[in-house]
From Swiss-Prot:
GO terms for cellular component: cytoplasm; nucleus; P-body; ribonucleoprotein complex. Belongs to the PAT1 family. Residues 42-75, 337-366 are annotated as: Disordered. One of its GO terms (biological process) is deadenylation-dependent decapping of nuclear-transcribed mRNA. Keywords: Cytoplasm, Nucleus, RNA-binding. It comes from the Eukaryota. Residues 49-59 have a biased composition (Basic and acidic residues). Residues 346-356 have a biased composition (Low complexity). PANTHER family: PROTEIN PAT1 HOMOLOG 2 (PTHR21551:SF3), TOPOISOMERASE II-ASSOCIATED PROTEIN PAT1 (PTHR21551). It is found in: Cytoplasm; Nucleus. This is Protein PAT1 homolog 2.
Length: 733
């Protein structure tokens, strides 16, 4: 490198190439410095520092003169003549011309040339040494005055900007930038001009991934130069770039012009080199907050917070730009926010994670299950279900909540804390139904009819209402059957209470059994009285026999027999046997008499020999209207023949047992006559007319062997088809 012709400063090279980045760093640093001043106040050294700075500016530095033919006309230096008797301040202009292979940097001075051999005394100037060794320069010490190497006077930059055709892209990508130093150092007007005028920054894309800042920062190696020695620029961190890259086409840039920020005079003395300085333009967050006009002291400038503090190495973190924060409105009572707080707020305003967006974008799998018409139908049905005759019972929690809410609102209105206003209430419909019974239309020969069924009025299956009708109409319309069914329903409800008490007996303590037993017996006696069980001659007038004509009546008697006393049960058995022919004739349609066989068999097994003879003789008496015996009809009915076999089998057990029978006088003769009569009738009945019994006892042939000959026994065996029994001895004829 020829020092006589040109001298390349690495710091100027960085400033010229990355001017936009340094401008952004300056704005953020100025925000922190102004926050420091507002927070901690001004130092006493603020009055002494400008004097020291002016002394440093008085020492000139000679720079080599560059060829003037490389300088464009648009960037000719404007020389100002000062009338002061002090040492003249030199105007320094830095011209950067990027070429394909190399970069030429030329520096023009105001008439003085630096020799190749520089005195050690001049290099001993503290300001020069600070610039050469990368230490904070005067501009970094006073954050109120900012110069990033783009221009010293903003009027010059405005001239360049006007020549660029009001295009922000040309301002950003301008290849040649000049820097001038004037003699206006640390003037209050310049500071006020920086503080009060906040540049408008258009929103642009953040293209930092492909920028030179991300690919290489000229990192930690120290730059060598024969005239300056080892020098390292001030380390800085990569940041977002607010302006677009020069490689982006002009059509992609904002259509409105970019207004460059106004800055005060440069604070560099002639013997100082612009380095990486602390730049701190700060704009208040609220428009009604004025910016302080006092300059920052070096002591306050040194105070940095968090990631904004100087670091000896490149930090992997970089601060977000202020464009996202320009849309954020801070409350009026908040005057200023620390930059770290602004960074946190900007991070909170970023969009949510991609996983949440994916979840929100998933289609609802149940969205199309019901059509709109079906949804409306369900809503109407649910609204119908809300109707209640007792809201405090059906909707207790909401009613209690609303009562508490009304009480609270009334207290607030009474105390004057709020205006009287009727709160919103979800009204539960209250329906008061009239207690009316509408009888269904009577249809002849039916138990009732199905009424119109709705959700308000369920259907009625039976209309059991009494009507005053003549006897002929009663027989014709079957009114008697309806009356019997009504009577059976009434007795059945009473019997259900008896069964409920019986179920409770197994779960209560033994000391309470007596009480429950008395209660149960009382209810059973009431049912027995209601049935009116008594001997009768006219079967049509007996309510009990009429009850046995319907299936529900037979089932009721079968379930009631185990709860009755023995004498009550024997009376029912006797009535059934006496009127067996009547019951068999009326049971031809339903054939439900078989439900009585089990309970009656239990009663028969408990009869004595005398009682058994009395019940069996009822089957051998001829009918009043004919000469036929009930035995003839009993052989043709399953319930009748089963009942007959059960009576004969129990008699054989009594005769075969060793237990004393205690018979009365003439009981054996009566029993023998009864067995002969049954055998005679059984032998006369054809086999085809006989039915199979519910149960065939095995001791019937033993009974007949006591009184009949061998030929008659074989004939009866063939008809009854009794199982094989041990050999027996027939009675000789």
């Amino acid at each position: 490198m020829n020092l006589g012709s040109e001298q390349i400063l690495p710091e100027d090279f960085y400033l010229a190439e990355e001017g936009a980045l340094l401008e952004e760093m300056a704005e953020e640093d100025e925000e922190i410095d102004l926050y420091n001043e507002v927070t901690f106040g001004l130092d006493q050294e603020s009055d002494e520092e400008p004097v020291k700075l002016e002394d440093d500016h008085t020492k000139p530095i000679q720079m080599p003169e560059a060829p003037k033919e490389e300088e464009p006309e648009a960037l000719q230096p404007v020389k100002e003549a000062k009338g002061s008797e002090k040492a003249p301040l030199h105007e320094v202009k830095i011209v950067v011309e990027p070429h394909e292979d190399h970069v030429d940097l030329s520096i023009d001075s105001g008439g003085h040339t630096m020799n190749s051999t520089m005195d050690d005394s001049e290099l001993g100037d503290p300001a020069v040494m600070k610039a050469f060794h990368g230490k904070p320069t005067l501009e970094s010490l006073d954050s109120a005055v900012v110069d990033s190497g783009i221009g010293s006077t903003w009027s010059e930059l405005d001239t360049d900007y006007d020549q660029s055709g009001m295009d922000s892209g040309l301002w950003e990508a301008s290849p040649k930038v000049s820097t001038y130093a004037t003699g206006q150092i640390l003037e209050d007007k310049a500071i006020l001009r920086i503080m009060e005028r906040a540049p408008y920054l258009p929103p642009t894309n953040l293209e930092f991934l492909g920028s030179p800042l991300q690919r290489g920062f000229m990192p930690s190696q120290r730059l060598q130069g024969p005239e300056m020695g080892a020098m390292s620029p001030k380390p800085y961190r990569p940041r977002f770039m607010r302006q677009q890259s020069p490689l982006v086409p002009r059509s992609m840039r904002p259509s409105y012009p970019f207004t460059p920020p106004r800055r005060g005079p440069s604070v560099f003395a002639p013997n100082q080199s612009p380095g990486f300085v602390s730049q701190t333009p700060f704009r208040p967050m609220s428009p009604n907050v004025s910016t302080p006009t006092r300059p920052m002291t070096p002591k306050m400038v040194r105070m940095h917070f968090g990631p904004m503090s100087p670091s000896p190495s490149f930090s992997p973190f970089f601060s977000p730009m202020g464009n996202a924060l320009q849309r954020f409105k801070v409350p009026g009572h908040v005057t200023q926010l620390h930059p770290q707080h602004r960074r946190i707020l900007s991070q909170r305003q970023r969009p949510q994670s991609s996983s949440r967006r994916q979840w929100e974008s998933r289609p609802d799998p149940y969205a199309s299950l019901m059509s709109q018409k079906e949804k409306e139908w369900v809503i109407k049905l649910q609204m119908i279900q809300l109707q209640s005759e007792n809201p405090h019972l059906d909707d207790y929690y909401y009613q209690a909540y609303y009562e508490n809410l009304e009480r609270k609102l009334s207290e607030e209105e009474f105390l004057g804390e709020r205006k009287k206003r009727e709160p919103t209430k979800l009204v539960t419909p209250y329906i008061q139904k009239a207690e009316t019974y509408e009888s269904v239309v009577h249809i002849e020969g039916s138990l009732g009819q199905v009424a119109v069924s709705t959700c308000y009025s369920p259907r009625r299956a039976i209309d059991a209402v009494s009507y005053a009708m003549p006897d002929e109409a009663i027989k014709a319309l079957g009114y008697q059957r309806l009356r019997v069914l009504k009577h059976a329903e009434k007795v059945f409800l009473m019997f259900l209470e008896v069964e409920e008490l019986a179920r409770k007996m197994s779960h209560i303590p033994e000391e309470e059994h007596v009480h429950f037993q008395h209660k149960q017996n009382y209810k059973v006696q009431r049912i027995y009285d209601v049935l009116k069980i008594a001997p009768c001659h006219n079967e049509e007038e007996s309510e009990f026999l009429q009850l046995l004509q319907v299936g529900k009546g037979k089932k009721l008697v079968a379930r009631l027999l185990p709860f009755l006393r023995s004498e009550q049960a024997r009376e029912i058995l006797l009535l059934v046997v006496q009127h067996l022919t009547f019951l068999i004739k009326n049971d031809s349609a339903e054939e439900s008499l078989s439900v009585l066989y089990g309970p009656l068999k239990t009663i028969i097994n408990g009869l004595s020999f005398t009682e058994l003879i009395g019940v069996t003789q009822e089957l051998t008496r001829p009918l009043p209207e004919s000469n036929d015996l009930p035995l003839t009809l009993a052989f043709q009915n399953q319930f009748g023949i089963s009942l007959l076999y059960c009576l004969l089998s129990h008699g054989e057990r009594l005769l075969s047992s060793d237990l004393p029978m205690e018979p009365c006088i003439g009981d054996f003769e009566k029993w023998t006559d009864t067995v002969f009569l049954v055998a005679k009738e059984l032998s006369h009945v054809s086999k085809s007319s006989m039915v199979e019994p519910l149960f065939l006892p095995s001791n019937l042939l033993s009974l007949f062997c006591r009184y009949l000959d061998k030929q008659t026994i074989h004939k009866l065996e063939d008809k009854m088809e009794c199982p094989v029994i041990p050999p027996y001895t027939a009675v000789p004829s």
